[in-house]
Amino acid sequence: MIWNTLVMDRSEQVRTTLGQMVTMAKQLVSAILCLALSIGFAQDDYTTKREQMVKSQLQARGIKDLATLDAMTNVPRHLFVPENMQEHAYIDGPLPIGNGQTISQPYIVAFMTEVLQLKSGDRVLEIGTGSGYQAAVLAKIVDSVYTIEIIKDLAKTAKDRLKELGYTNVTVKWGDGYHGWPAKAPFNAIMVTAGADSIPRPLLDQLKDGGRMIIPVGPYNAIRQLVLAKKKKNKITTQNLMAVRFVPFTREKKQD
């Protein structure tokens, strides 16, 4: 009798333990499903915001290049801003990304991309990586993007982010962008995302014949002109496109 009681008690304990494990497993599965649904809904929400951004901010203002529109429809801008700014990633304006720098207004990103008239086989140099967003947009269109960022923390963060998101055709370098990237030149197009007092000659020298460069030019801490420079038979022509505000072109400090 005592043996039977012990066996029954042990069996009851086993059943109880198994029941608890089943309950815990169900709770875990439920939690995972809820998390997956939450992430899915969040992604769907960002996808909708991105599509609305393209329609209301880009197409409505005259952006027509299909490659540019497609790139900005697919690049997750919210993943290129600080986490506490992600809800605002698709607003019609620039956003701070730290170190006194900003991610440009979506329309400006699209406009600068469109005027370069990029093709799939192009090699592009970007000066001023920032968050890496503009490089990601370019990477959706061309074969190779080389981008230089003078602020070390931003360069590292952008490099890691672009790698994590699968932009394998972007190469990030920490350094002074004024002198360009001679080892990777010449380039079909150059984009400068910081305001300079004048167009750096080394960048013009690194343009291919028929190449185009877009750069904000003007006095420090003032409204600048977005300038399109074209190179043909070693001659440079420039055209002012619009008035803009950009963070200043930062140079490497000279050692005394």
Description of each model-found segment:
Residues 1-25:
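N-terminal secretory signal peptides that target proteins for export/translocation
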Residues 255-256:
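Positively charged
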Residues 117-236:
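Conserved nucleotide-cofactor-binding alpha/beta core module
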Residues 34-41:
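Hydrophobic h-region of N-terminal signal peptides that target proteins for export
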Residues 41-125, 136, 141, 156, ...:
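Class I SAM-dependent transferase core
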Residues 1, 100-103, 149:
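Short, surface-exposed alpha-helical recognition segments that flank or form part
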Residues 25-34:
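Sec-dependent signal peptide recognition
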